[in-house]
């Protein structure tokens, strides 16, 4: 009887440990598959809001995009972008290494590498993608159950134009191209889970923070 009880006790412990292991795996898988997508027309405040989220949620990690443009003086390869030659970028397209990619401005290519998202998941963090509108729609379609998408928009196209001018990096044709693209992208806002109108940056940051906090608790 004592032997039988000991065997039963050992079996119960083993069963409990096995159940706990599978529950842990399930929880890890659910967290691993989560992905946050922040998108907006250029000049809407997307970068500032993304930085705020990363500063306030340690479980988030910025997904570094790949790009074929030349780095600016303050940018570092592997930190701000993965700077690739156009040949390397196209090789990765052919090898199906991108989660999404697009030719954005002036023939320059940008994209999200699958390996980058996997790197973040392997660290048991949630990737935050700061990407173009078309790419955001594509990624959301690949993760319909486990993604959170936030579309940031300016109060108006005129305000967006004013913000772009204040940067001092756009003028003439390039400015008009960005404004035209932004007006087009605004028509896609209904594709995303949440829309934040960035009239006041601090309020927009708080709204994004509340949305992300709820998503991470699911």
Predicted regions: what is each one?
Residues 67-127, 134-137:
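ATP-dependent small-molecule kinase phosphotransfer cores
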